[in-house]
Amino acid sequence: SKILMPGLRMGLMVVPTELVERTVVSKHNSDISTSPLIQKSLYYYMSKFNWDKHSSDMEKIYTDKFLETYKYINKKLGGRLTIVKNKGGINFFLGLNRGFSSRNFVNFMYNKKVALQPGYIYYDLDIEDRFFRINISMETMDRIKEAIDIISDSLDEFYALSRIEAKGL
């Protein structure tokens, strides 16, 4: 979908807070199957246009974006967060210090206008809830860098608030 029709979305969901996690998992599961609309669009595109050129152009765009983001993440967050080696895709998994929750961090960052996803929804096994995901497919490089800057500027505040909450103050 990122190569053929990046950003194709149909509809809007307003979900009660208590259902957000289940909804994200559900949406992720539905996204991994290919709808007839996408299949027909791909057939049309391949038969009417130069698919090879389009595919090559998209690969270059996303590779350049990925590499620039990778460098920026390492510059701003390297040594402060665990950066998981990417094994494909155009997203990044980062880990908070041990003992801190990505679910809490995702909510904390959402209030700062940065949308992240908790990493646990991408794993089959229970793991430490400290990893989160950054997806770069739809954002501009300026917005990606802005979001990384906000994450960098907010880490110490998040850690401090989490410690206070853990002490029950």
Question: Could you describe each region identified by the protein language model?
Answer:
Residues 1-60:
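Conserved core segment of the aminotransferase class I/II
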Residues 16-17, 47, 95-97, 137-139:
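Residue-level recognition of strand-loop junctions within catalytic nucleotide-signaling folds
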Residues 43, 56-70, 82-95, 105-108:
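Conserved glycine-rich beta-strand-loop-beta hairpin in the small C-terminal domain of fold type I
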Residues 111-112, 125-169:
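PLP-dependent enzyme catalytic core of the Aspartate aminotransferase-like
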